[in-house]
């Protein structure tokens, strides 16, 4: 089985089941005769662009990113470690030296409701158009953590 076929199978599993962990995905693949290493599975999930969301009971589950309306690219989500909100502003935390990279990604995405960004070494201030938009973006980014 090649990479594309394996990733299609992963997408099918995610759409059919409420899957919460990579181990669950790996077990489903094994039941179908597909053996993958943890590293390969992690890479596949990142390339597919899966999001982790919370259901009504607060349990995490994987979802295909095309099923969730999000203005943020998978690259943006990759850098965010933590998100906090203060009114109409978001504070995004990254690894040391990555905040400016994240700022450039967000600025290049040209999201209409983001007025601007200010980056430090590991912290990024995102200024949103209003508080409701900031709340929505906070929820969106936190779901991917």
Swiss-Prot record:
Transmembrane segments: none
The keyword Lipid metabolism is annotated on this UniProt entry: no
GO CC aspect terms: cytoplasm
Keyword terms, alphabetized: Amino-acid biosynthesis, Arginine biosynthesis, Cytoplasm, DNA-binding, Repressor, Transcription, Transcription regulation
Source superkingdom: Bacteria
GO molecular function (one): DNA-binding transcription factor activity
Pathway the protein takes part in: Amino-acid biosynthesis; L-arginine biosynthesis [regulation]
Localization terms from the record: Cytoplasm
InterPro entries membership: Arg_repress, Arg_repress_C, Arg_repress_C_sf, Arg_repress_DNA-bd, WH-like_DNA-bd_sf, WH_DNA-bd_sf
Keyword Nucleus: no
BP GO annotations: L-arginine biosynthetic process; protein complex oligomerization; regulation of arginine biosynthetic process
Function description: Regulates arginine biosynthesis genes.
Family, as annotated: Belongs to the ArgR family.
Name of this chain's protein: Arginine repressor
